[in-house]
Amino acid sequence: MDANKPSYLGLLNAIALGEGRAHQYLSCWAAKTTDPDVKKVLQTVAIREGEHSHAFTKRLCELGFGVLDRPDPSFDKNMAIANADCSDLEKFEALGFGQREERDPFTKVFDDLTIDIRTGELLGRYIAEERDSGRMLRGCYQVLRERAGRGRGADASARDLSDLHHRLDEICAAIGKLQQEVTALRR
């Protein structure tokens, strides 16, 4: 790697591309929805995504580099979903909402200690806005699920039962370990 080339250029490039593409399909979906509440959320998030794309493109330029286009195999699929003649709830689910949430994808961003101050500020704002956008989209999805009679109640019961089973397994394992320790102490 070039000694003058920042180690985080790939990250900035990926954000610029991903956010620009998200802006496109969310804008398409916002134009197509007939629900004013969904439209408001989608427009807000789409505007943020577009602004992020421009801000990271600008930062790459300030660092003396440009955006390198990389293919995104999911982009055409996401555009087709956004433009589909189906419900907003179906679009959310086709885009992966309702699946088990993964860990926060941003926790490792600042592990690179070479990130300069201006880039760090930009990344910090980006992460805060992405987390907020995620909350907005998940909230919108939940409202649509509740309207469709598939709200939190059913999910909560299944999740609570799963959590209860997991905790019982942990308790049984702890009891087994304690029994072994007591037996060992008696010897």
Regions found by a protein language model. Name each.
Residues 1-187:
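Non-heme di-metal
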